[in-house]
A protein has these predicted regions:
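Acidic, glycine-rich A-domain
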Residues: 1-114
Length: 114
């Protein structure tokens, strides 16, 4: 339940300032989902909430990277991939669990862009 977790820890984030760049790295299974007795967090509501939390993080000047990590081949046009991109925007990355070096590559690209 990414959006719920992000909201719960938001006060711990350190916004950028003149002396500090801030980054938020998220590893995800792709879908925000949490069922409970009398409670359900998933689908479009969770997707919208997660996107809202990502935008709040980014409004603090924090650059975000979120990785959809899976052991199956990711089809960029799948509903899961489209959902993930809607939640995380330009910070959304699809990663094959068998090639986690992709994480360091994209992180380095972000750091060097500064």
């Amino acid at each position: 339940p990414e959006g719920l977790c992000f909201e719960a820890i938001m006060k711990e984030f350190v916004p950028i300032n003149n002396d500090l760049d801030s980054y938020f790295l998220n590893l995800s299974d792709g879908q925000p989902y949490f069922p409970g007795e009398g409670f359900y967090y998933g689908g479009a509501v969770a997707e919208t909430h997660t996107n809202k939390m990502v935008k709040m993080i980014e409004s603090m000047g924090i650059q975000t990277l979120s990785y959809f990590i899976t052991d199956w081949e990711i089809n960029e046009d799948s509903s899961d991939a489209r959902c993930f991109k809607r939640m995380y925007g330009k910070g959304a990355k699809m990663i094959d669990v068998k090639n986690v070096n992709q994480i360091t590559k994209t992180m380095n690209q972000l750091f060097l862009a500064k």
